[in-house]
């Protein structure tokens, strides 16, 4: 566990400045807000056309992901700025403030990764089992799955309030999170369980993305043989619309880069918890703070990944690549676009 110098610190170290926190807060608000505007414009554009089930579900999941990131930023970042303004650590405001901040950080890290997992699973199921997907999966599933994920994440992150796990303050006094190096076995079990859940989600997302790549390659091979635009399921024409391969590539690219960001932001925390469990319990404020910073910037980077990988940007890249391909394969036809 953290020693008294950080765990019960009353004032913020003067060497730390609120500028990075303020920049992160502004970038998170602006980025997530802009991403929501782009999503709404696409939704209205899509409403003018015949809807596609998989696009509607994907749109809802991505919107939920962006809204969750925005909410997490709004609920956590202002507390840090207030702490800097009063030069008072979270624990010295009130212990409940530290517990609230720890819950917020833990909850939004878990729910965001869970939503990305659901999005990757949606693409995996859509391409791997298109007939079943078209018959049984609709956007209504999102209104069932998303609340269930929120309920599970909430209950799990409330456990430290019932003495299974604990939220503690980290240097410089503006961070609270689960105790990554606890002495009590029940608190250590909770930290390991949290890290394991995060690791399993990340690995599962990577596997799903690999499966989607495999299915896209098979679609590409079939298209080369047939010489026509690929469809997800020809035998279910009454239930399915034509879906260009470019649309699936766009979805894959978005999920892939978001997964990379999550891996980079999550692994330091997972490694830190496991090292504390297997090591000699020596604390390292620098490593703890590094892990917390990585996990916190995820909600800031996510919307910018979405913005930079909007269809117009992706199409520009894809058609640029296609111009360099041979005329025999005519890859430009492969990327016939249908807006999300």
Regions flagged by a language model, labelled:
Residues 111-118, 125, 131-175, 200-207:
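Fourth transmembrane helix
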Residues 264, 270-274, 289-336, 340:
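Seventh transmembrane helix
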Residues 14-22, 54-119, 126-129, 133-134:
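Extracellular TM2-ECL1-early TM3 structural module of rhodopsin-like
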Residues 21, 25, 38-40, 71-88, ...:
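Helix-to-loop junction signature of class
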Residues 29-43, 66, 73-80, 107-131, ...:
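Cytoplasm-facing ends of alpha-helical transmembrane segments in multi-pass membrane proteins
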Residues 1-42:
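Extracellular N-terminal segment of 7TM GPCRs
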């Amino acid at each position: 566990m953290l020693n008294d110098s950080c765990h019960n610190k009353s004032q913020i170290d003067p060497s730390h400045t609120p500028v990075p926190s303020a920049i992160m807060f502004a970038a998170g608000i602006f980025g997530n807000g802009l991403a929501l505007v782009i999503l709404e414009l696409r939704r209205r554009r899509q409403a003018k056309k015949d809807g596609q089930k998989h696009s509607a579900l994907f749109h809802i999941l991505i919107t939920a992901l962006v809204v969750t990131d925005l909410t997490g930023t709004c609920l956590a970042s202002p507390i840090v700025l207030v702490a800097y303004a009063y030069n008072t650590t979270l624990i010295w405001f009130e212990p409940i403030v530290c517990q609230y901040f720890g819950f917020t950080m833990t909850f939004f890290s878990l729910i965001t990764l869970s939503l990305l997992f659901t999005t990757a699973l949606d693409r995996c199921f859509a391409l791997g089992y298109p007939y079943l997907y078209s018959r049984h999966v609709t956007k209504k599933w999102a209104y069932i799955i998303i609340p269930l994920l929120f309920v599970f994440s909430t209950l799990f992150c409330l456990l430290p309030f019932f003495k299974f796990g604990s939220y503690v303050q980290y240097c410089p006094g503006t961070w609270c999170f689960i105790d990554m190096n606890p002495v009590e076995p029940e608190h250590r079990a909770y930290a390991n369980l949290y890290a394991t859940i995060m690791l399993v989600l990340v690995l599962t997302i990577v596997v799903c993305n690999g499966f989607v790549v495999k299915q896209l390659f098979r679609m590409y091979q079939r298209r080369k043989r047939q010489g026509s635009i690929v469809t997800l399921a020809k035998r279910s024409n009454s239930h399915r619309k034509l879906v260009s391969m470019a649309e699936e590539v766009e979805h894959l690219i978005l999920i892939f880069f978001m997964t990379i960001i999550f891996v980079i932001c999550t692994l330091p925390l997972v490694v830190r918890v496991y090292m504390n469990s297997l090591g000699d319990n020596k604390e390292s404020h620098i490593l703890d703070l590094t892990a917390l910073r990585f996990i916190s910037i995820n909600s800031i980077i996510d919307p910018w990944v979405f913005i930079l990988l909007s269809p117009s940007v992706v199409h520009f890249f894809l058609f640029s690549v296609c111009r360099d391909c041979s005329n025999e394969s005519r890859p430009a036809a492969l990327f016939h676009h249908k807006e999300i």
